[in-house]
């Protein structure tokens, strides 16, 4: 397993309090603790590879060698790996004000029993790349007021797999770990996801108990109370009031029924068409041919009925009358 050599620096960058220098392969990064609340231009100190790492009061500032990217890490972050291009920087938590070399508690190094002073000094100058097991005991995501947020189900799942992934491949970057954990979470069994949801709810309850000032008594959103607020205090009606209400309802019902019947009758009168008068059968009159009309097809030379006989003068007179 790769390791980092830590050397103390005491004669570099006068005016700043040096902390330590980290050698990782060909890269050498110098860490300096700044006494200013904000970073100023004089706080930036260039190392051998022109990369800049500066400790602030509450943050760690890192600038890439080509000055194309800047990263700021807030405390506490323990041992964190940050990726820039094709090389990594491992930074340590800020040590105490008095010593110049990081203490064992800060670096997470356990002192073996029976070791001499030289072995202890040599072990204090080595930082293991493996993250400590208690690195994610508290969430590093903070709210605007500085209080850590409760961890959700995915964050708990991420932290549960982190030690296993680092033990299998210590060279994994944060981006690769996030991609791997996301793929495992999407293919995880629903029962396992339900278990992590329960753990997340327990985390919320713990966070509520530790930070009651963040949870006011009156919630902003409606709760999932099985009993609605309108059912918590049942309405009690006396028998006298009940009878009075029933009589009022009967009166209103009768009035509404009468008004409804009148409206229906008026509507039926308007909509229903008037019935037509009945017409009797057409009378069957006998056709009587008038006797003064002569059929032109009748042969006058043939003997006719004496009642219908006409003289020649009558016939001529009739024809002239018809012609005029």
Curated annotation (Swiss-Prot):
UniProt xrefs under PROSITE patterns: HMG_BOX_2
Keyword Ligase among UniProt keywords: no
UniProt keyword annotation of DNA-binding present: yes
A single cellular component GO annotation: nucleus
Localization per Swiss-Prot or TrEMBL: Nucleus
Alphabetic keyword roster: DNA-binding, Nucleus, Transcription, Transcription regulation
InterPro entries linked: HMG_box_dom, HMG_box_dom_sf
GO MF annotations, alphabetized: DNA binding
The entry's DNA-binding region: 147-215
Stated name of the protein: Mating-type protein A-3
Species of the source: Neurospora crassa (strain ATCC 24698 / 74-OR23-1A / CBS 708.71 / DSM 1257 / FGSC 987)
């Amino acid at each position: 397993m790769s390791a980092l050599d830590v050397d103390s620096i005491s004669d570099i960058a006068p005016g700043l309090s040096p902390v330590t220098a980290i050698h990782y392969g060909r890269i050498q990064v110098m860490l300096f603790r700044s006494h200013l609340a904000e970073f100023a231009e004089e706080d930036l100190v260039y190392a051998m590879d022109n990369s800049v790492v500066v400790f602030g009061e509450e943050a760690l500032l890192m600038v890439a060698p080509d000055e194309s990217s800047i990263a700021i890490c807030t405390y506490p972050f323990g041992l964190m790996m940050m990726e820039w291009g094709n090389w990594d920087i491992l930074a340590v938590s800020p040590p105490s004000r008095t010593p110049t070399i990081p203490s064992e508690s800060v670096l997470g190094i356990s002192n073996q029993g029976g070791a001499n002073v030289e072995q202890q000094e040599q072990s204090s100058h080595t930082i293991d790349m493996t993250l400590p097991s208690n690195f994610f005991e508290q969430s590093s995501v903070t709210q605007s007021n500085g209080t850590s947020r409760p961890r959700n189900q995915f964050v708990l799942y991420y932290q549960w797999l982190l030690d296993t992934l680092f033990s299998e491949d210590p060279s994994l970057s944060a981006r690769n770990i996030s991609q791997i954990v996301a793929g495992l979470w999407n293919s995880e069994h629903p029962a396992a996801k339900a278990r992590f949801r329960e753990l997340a709810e327990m985390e919320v309850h713990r966070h509520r108990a530790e930070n009651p000032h963040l949870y006011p008594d009156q919630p902003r959103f409606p709760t999932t109370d099985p009993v609605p607020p309108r059912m918590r205090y049942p309405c009690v009606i006396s028998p006298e009031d009940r009878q009075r209400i029933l009589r009022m309802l009967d009166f209103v019902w009768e009035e509404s029924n009468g008004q409804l019947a009148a409206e229906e009758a008026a509507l039926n009168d308007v909509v229903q068409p008037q019935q037509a008068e009945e017409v009797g059968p057409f009378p069957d009159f006998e056709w009587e041919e008038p006797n003064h009309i002569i059929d032109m097809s009748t042969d006058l030379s043939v003997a006719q009925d004496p009642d219908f006989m006409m003289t020649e003068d009558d016939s001529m007179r009739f024809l002239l009358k018809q012609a005029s």
